[in-house]
């Protein structure tokens, strides 16, 4: 459990209280199989979400009734029988089946990274929730090592971009090169066209270079010249940055900061962890090897289950209350108006929902509890709540504001 802020345990309901919630609904759908026998498949009721083992079209489906029929019949979803509700137990079983790679991946990460449990958990959550992650900390805290280890443990394309003050946007997205032989332009794609992109020390480059990532991070596509190219289905930007007080750094544009699902503060290791680091790394010949544990396809399948994790209406309202409390704290009886310059954007609502579902997934549950939301609130919101000059003068941070909101709002 995350202990970064004090929680009133008496206000967190027992998990049994959530068992009576209406179960998530699913749609029964037919799908064409190789044996041509009509079978049933599940869609969890989300427009872009399918059961983790099958890929289905939410709006229509095809049925091949027999080997003699060569033309599939396309039927509208409107003519189908009412959907059957999926029980919490069935959701839990789906989570258990699709999370087989979580434990081996954590063990592989811990082989090279000592301590930093919260960092590792946050990286996995960003992977499952299909959101980008920003790591902030002083140099030497294994930020880059953690991201490189994660990328190596996944069977996917990985590119590293070392941000420097003299970079150009074309160094990231690519450019068009004139070909005098054929008298035309050819497109040379940049390192952003990968499954995993490590933006190392992203705030070492000026804003115009940092902004080259904006389109790819939000729309999962990149425009070079007059051509637009899609990015891979599994696409994750993992960025590191040094605190802004460090010499030679540039603040990230607000539009880019808001595109990161999580901002994780990487802290120094404990004395016991540092002793283990000394024992393992105290040699001039350090050999760090990483085994591939999971494929991009497995991650894609797990994401479908994460999207289907059930969230009760009261839990959804709790998320909305947290976000709105950052914009209008007086409405919730909080005297924080003078300390908040800007509250969280709607992206905060979406990302807090997705990361809470991923947190439930890694804990083996098919439903979200208020504790999942509290666990993720700081990482999702700390870079979305801008504090005023009064707050800075009094030493009040966005984390202090978020913590007070979490400790004040009633828990469903």
Report each predicted region and the residues it spans.
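Walker B catalytic acidic pair
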Residues: 200-201, 212
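Conserved alpha-helical scaffold flanking the Walker A/P-loop in AAA+ ATPase domains
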Residues: 179-198
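C-terminal engagement/docking regions of AAA+ P-loop ATPases
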Residues: 77-87, 330-412
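Pre-Walker A (pre-P-loop) alpha-helix and adjacent loop at the N terminus of AAA/AAA+ ATPase modules
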Residues: 96-133, 138
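Short beta-strand-centered segment that lines the nucleotide-binding/catalytic pocket of NTP-utilizing
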Residues: 157-169, 226-230
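Walker A/P-loop
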Residues: 128-164
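Conserved C-terminal "switch" segment of AAA+ ATPases
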Residues: 94-97, 112, 249, 263-336, ...
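Canonical AAA+ ATPase core
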Residues: 179-183, 205, 209, 217-308, ...
């Amino acid at each position: 459990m995350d202990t970064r802020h004090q929680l009133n345990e008496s206000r967190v309901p027992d998990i049994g209280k959530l068992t009576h919630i209406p179960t998530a609904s699913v749609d029964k759908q037919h799908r064409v199989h190789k044996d041509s026998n009509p079978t049933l498949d599940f869609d969890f009721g989300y427009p872009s979400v399918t059961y983790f083992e099958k890929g289905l079209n939410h709006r229509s489906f095809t049925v091949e009734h027999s080997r003699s029929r060569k033309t599939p019949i396309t039927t509208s979803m409107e003519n189908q029988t009412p959907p059957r509700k999926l029980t919490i137990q069935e959701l839990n079983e789906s989570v258990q089946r699709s999370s087989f790679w979580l434990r081996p991946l954590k063990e592989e990460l811990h082989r090279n990274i000592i301590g930093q449990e919260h960092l590792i958990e946050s990286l996995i959550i960003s992977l499952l929730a299909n959101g980008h992650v920003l790591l902030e900390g002083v140099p030497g805290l294994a930020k880059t090592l953690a991201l490189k280890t994660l990328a190596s443990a996944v069977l996917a394309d990985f590119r590293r971009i070392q941000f420097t003050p003299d970079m150009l946007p074309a160094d990231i997205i690519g450019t068009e090169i004139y070909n005098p032989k054929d008298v035309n332009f050819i497109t040379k794609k940049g390192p952003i066209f990968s499954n995993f992109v490590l933006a190392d020390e992203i705030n070492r480059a000026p804003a115009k270079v940092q902004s080259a990532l904006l389109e790819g991070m939000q729309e999962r596509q990149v425009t070079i010249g007059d051509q637009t190219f899609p990015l891979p289905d599994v696409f994750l930007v993992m960025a590191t940055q040094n605190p802004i007080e460090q010499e030679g750094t540039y603040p990230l544009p607000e539009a880019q900061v808001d595109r990161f699902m999580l901002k994780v503060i990487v802290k120094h290791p404990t004395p016991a962890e540092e002793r283990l680091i000394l024992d393992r790394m105290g040699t001039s010949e350090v050999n760090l090897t990483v085994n591939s544990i999971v494929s991009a396809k497995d991650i894609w399948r797990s994401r479908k289950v994460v999207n289907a994790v059930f969230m009760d209406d009261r839990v959804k309202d709790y998320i909305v209350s947290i976000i709105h409390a950052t914009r209008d704290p007086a409405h919730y009886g909080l005297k924080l108006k003078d300390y908040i310059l800007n509250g969280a954007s709607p992206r905060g609502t979406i990302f807090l929902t997705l990361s809470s579902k991923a947190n439930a997934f890694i804990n083996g549950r098919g439903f979200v509890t208020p504790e999942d939301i509290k666990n993720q609130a700081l990482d999702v919101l700390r870079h979305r709540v801008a504090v005023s000059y009064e707050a800075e003068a009094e030493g009040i941070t966005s984390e202090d504001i978020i913590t007070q909101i979490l400790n004040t709002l009633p828990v469903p």
